[in-house]
């Protein structure tokens, strides 16, 4: 039942992202903060989404190099810019976690980055689904290799984490990495939780070109 609820939360969230595009909210000359505010209004007014389980992220230009804990200065979307949006809506008490990249313009390098990070997500998903046992650290290293295979650097500290009914499971030790896809988490991702239930993982990819100061992002439920 949990997987079905999570898939429903993701489905609603994907429709939400489509509405962001259909309403032409992503345009040059708009600040990240303004776009974030408009996204929140759309979530509430169109989809009845009031709560998000993690901070709402809109990052453009060089801010796309920032990792989740960072809080870079507000930036204005420019012509031929790249940006990504990372949202964690709560839908009927279940968590979604969706990230998408957008390119304002036709810059070929940025379009390649957008396409490569999305294609890599599905390649990794297909590989993951063939496994019956897998350390989180092994998936992280596989994601790093996929980034390098496409000519990018892997920009994130993690390559994912668990989700569930809000609030999702937390480790007994707040400093533990056991519920993150992290290079130092050598636990099997297929292990059940403390109650014997299946864990559900988000795969998040951030590919970057540090020299050109651009990053691409794609995230959703494995």
Language-model-derived ranges and their functions:
Residues 1-222:
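Active-site neighborhoods and metal-handling regions in enzymes and metal-associated proteins
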């Amino acid at each position: 039942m949990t997987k079905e609820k999570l898939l429903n939360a993701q489905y609603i969230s994907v429709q939400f992202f489509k509405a962001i595009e259909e309403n032409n909210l992503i345009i040059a000359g708009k600040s990240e903060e303004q776009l974030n505010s408009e996204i929140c209004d759309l979530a509430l007014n169109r989809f009845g989404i009031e709560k998000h389980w993690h901070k709402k992220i809109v990052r453009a230009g060089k801010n796309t190099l920032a990792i989740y804990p960072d809080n870079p200065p507000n930036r204005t979307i420019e012509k031929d810019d790249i940006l990504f949006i990372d949202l964690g809506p709560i839908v009927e008490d279940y968590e979604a976690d969706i990230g998408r990249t957008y390119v304002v313009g036709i810059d070929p390098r940025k379009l390649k980055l957008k396409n490569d990070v999305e294609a890599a997500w599905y390649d990794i998903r297909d590989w993951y689904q063939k496994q019956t046992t897998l350390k989180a650290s092994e998936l992280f290293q596989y994601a790093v290799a996929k980034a390098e295979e496409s000519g990018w650097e892997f920009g994130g500290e993690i390559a994912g984490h668990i989700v569930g009914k809000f609030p999702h499971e937390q480790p007994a030790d707040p400093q533990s990495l056991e519920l993150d896809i992290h290079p130092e988490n050598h636990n099997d991702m297929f292990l059940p939780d403390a109650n014997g239930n299946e864990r559900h993982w988000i795969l998040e990819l951030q590919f970057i070109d540090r020299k050109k100061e651009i990053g691409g992002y794609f995230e959703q439920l494995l």
